[in-house]
Curated annotation (Swiss-Prot):
Compartments, record wording: Periplasm
Thermal characteristics: Thermostable.
Name by which UniProt lists this protein: Metallo-beta-lactamase type 2
Gene Ontology cellular component list: periplasmic space
Cofactor or coenzyme needed: Zn(2+)
Keyword Cell membrane: no
Cited function: Confers resistance to the different beta-lactams antibiotics (penicillin, cephalosporin and carbapenem) via the hydrolysis of the beta-lactam ring. Benzylpenicillin is a better substrate than cephalosporin C and ampicillin.
InterPro entries referenced in this protein's UniProt entry, alphabetically: BcII-like_MBL-B1, Beta-lactamase_class-B_CS, Metallo-B-lactamas, NDM-1-like, RibonucZ/Hydroxyglut_hydro
Origin species: Bacillus cereus
Binding site for substrate: K200, N209
Effect caused by changing D110N: No change in activity
Catalytic activity: a beta-lactam + H2O = a substituted beta-amino acid
Amino acid sequence: MKNTLLKLGVCVSLLGITPFVSTISSVQAERTVEHKVIKNETGTISISQLNKNVWVHTELGYFSGEAVPSNGLVLNTSKGLVLVDSSWDDKLTKELIEMVEKKFKKRVTDVIITHAHADRIGGMKTLKERGIKAHSTALTAELAKKNGYEEPLGDLQSVTNLKFGNMKVETFYPGKGHTEDNIVVWLPQYQILAGGCLVKSASSKDLGNVADAYVNEWSTSIENVLKRYGNINLVVPGHGEVGDRGLLLHTLDLLK
């Protein structure tokens, strides 16, 4: 999220088939992927298909008086639905859960929280009320409590390998960056990285909200992600359009 906020374009559109294009100067990558996008009636929540079992969820929240879209993932597993990140608040999170449960005819069983800012953790009360397991690092749980949120489980280590039905998931803490607790989520079967707010979109012109950032350590953390995941297919940033590993390189450029 931002203090000096860029106006970000919503990375979804009306129900139908829509292309998204990612162009990053750091690499040659210019990618167009056709995918289904489903929106709620008010346009505040959208889910965008990356493949059969992985969708991006995007909610429009407000920061410093401006509408800002925030991304997470919906994982359609054989044992239920798993979200990467909740949403800005309980109302949006509740509607998101109801939307995906209706779409996939499965319950949301688990959520992975990537850091303790409102756009990730704002729906913790709703998750607790619904008996949904909210996984996080111990540091994120500590910061959540400090910031007045319900605490997630705090069960994730620096590297944690999880399996939800037929879906393998790895969480990785690469070091400090956007926040001291930011993690990324890796889907090895699909080579998809959920970069959260550690990774900037192609349209980002600056680092955005650095109130809780560790700018001097951010580059090292991005490099740690690049070293660990050399075969990235798609990258989902915390805000803005989906791209490829070039988004990591673009983030490094912004940090120079």
